[in-house]
Amino acid sequence: MDPNCSCPTGGSCSCAGSCTCKACRCPSCKKSCCSCCPVGCAKCAQGCVCKGASDKCSCCA
C-alpha cells in the first residue's frame, strides 16, 4: 500500500485499522488520519484513524 495513500478525489484506497498512510481522506474508508485523541473524544473516535501521540491531537480541538 502506498504510505501516502494518494488516491484520486472520490477514489478508493485500502485504509487499515491502524493508520499507516499520511494523508488518507478517501470515501472508501470515510476516515482521515489524525493524532490519537483522549478516550473521551467522540469526534475523533467516529471520524479518525488513530495516528501519533495524544498530546498532538488536532481533530478535537
From Swiss-Prot:
Domain of life: Eukaryota
InterPro entries named in the record: Metalthion_dom_sf (IPR017854), Metalthion_dom_sf_vert (IPR023587), Metalthion_vert (IPR000006), Metalthion_vert_metal_BS (IPR018064)
UniProt binding sites for a divalent metal cation 7: C50, C57, C59, C60
Matching PROSITE patterns: METALLOTHIONEIN_VRT (PS00203)
GO BP, one annotated term: cellular response to zinc ion
Residues where N-acetylmethionine is found: M1
Region called Beta, residue ranges: 1-29
Single GO cellular component term: cytoplasm
Region span, Alpha: 30-61
Binding-site list for a divalent metal cation 5: C34, C36, C37, C50
Residues where a divalent metal cation 4 binds: C33, C34, C44, C48
Entry keyword set: Acetylation, Metal-binding, Metal-thiolate cluster, Phosphoprotein
Alphabetized Pfam families for the sequence: Metallothio
Binding site for a divalent metal cation 2: C7, C13, C15, C26
Subunit structure, as described in the record: Monomer.
Family statement: Belongs to the metallothionein superfamily. Type 1 family.
Comment on protein domains: Class I metallothioneins contain 2 metal-binding domains: four divalent ions are chelated within cluster A of the alpha domain and are coordinated via cysteinyl thiolate bridges to 11 cysteine ligands. Cluster B, the corresponding region within the beta domain, can ligate three divalent ions to 9 cysteines.
Protein name: Metallothionein-1A
GN (gene name): MT1A
